[in-house]
């Protein structure tokens, strides 16, 4: 993969910037959109990468959704306790992988998909809205009354209104239902106690309110949590982001504030992602906001911002919002020498031949 290398002078400038950064967390996304296809299972394959991940100074690894899902990638889950039906591997392999990470002092982050859920059976209307928990005590055996009342055609009108954005491909779960709250919190605690996960990445977190997210974070007490709140930036007539993205980053700040700013909750800094995509194309002036600070969430609340260059949605084979491929190392030079918790993407680290360059930047950041 073609890549534009940093000049020595730019690297030295960035080295100077990094001097003010204290050692801290570095997140690693340990999969891409195609990882489920790997022969022999992704969990087993990733086991062979643990030493390299740990040696790079990475502190947390974000793993793919672990539950049974009608979509191979895991983002359409149904039987939440069933970890043996995952395309990435089985429950025993997952526990072995997490054990290997823990053995190197690296924490494991689960991809939590709770905005929506796929049903096993149809009700009397012929609608798939009867959920199977595969537990001996009927936990997660839900019906249409556990679906948001405004989520047609799945709902039967007895649930509470949705507290966030609609997800059209599957029933939106009613997170104001007390039984739903209780049983999902129990499942999260099971993922911690029995499987070994340390924290959560909340998928499609804009699908339910920050108050709802707070319930699950408070009841499961993860050491780290990060939310995906992906909304559109403000764009000008030239099709590029406006210089002022205060409204966009304020939404991220508000979410963390409502969940509890003193707790473990963070959000992916999509504001910085969008601005950086354009800035590296010869418009570095965009990296200074209207207030003279960094223009993303890291300019306002860096301790709660997780920066990234690409992920399984924006990059990989989906290419929903890809970073310029020939300037990826410029992106890493920025996020690894600026405040916030940087997230390194598997593809860039292992598949694009950028491991050594990223390693060096992480070493600069952590003082290793």
Swiss-Prot record:
Residue numbers marked as site, Transition state stabilizer: 313
UniProt cross-references to Gene3D superfamilies, sorted A to Z: Glycosidases
Required co-factors: Ca(2+)
Protein residues bound to Ca(2+) 3: 151, 166-167, 170, 172
EC number: 3.2.1.1
Keywords, sorted A to Z: Calcium, Carbohydrate metabolism, Germination, Glycosidase, Hydrolase, Metal-binding, Signal
Binding residues for substrate: 75-76, 201-206, 230, 232, 250, 257, 293, 299-301, 312, 318
Note on cofactor: Binds 3 Ca(2+) ions per subunit.
Catalytic residues of the enzyme: 203, 228
Annotated GO MF terms: alpha-amylase activity; metal ion binding
Binding-site residues for Ca(2+) 1, renumbered to this chain: 115, 162, 165, 172, 207
Gene Ontology terms describing biological process: carbohydrate metabolic process
Catalytic activity: Endohydrolysis of (1->4)-alpha-D-glucosidic linkages in polysaccharides containing three or more (1->4)-alpha-linked D-glucose units
Residues noted as binding Ca(2+) 2 in the record, renumbered to the chain: 132, 135, 137, 141
Enzyme class: hydrolase
Quaternary structure and partners: Monomer.
Family: Belongs to the glycosyl hydrolase 13 family.
Name this protein carries in UniProt: Alpha-amylase type B isozyme
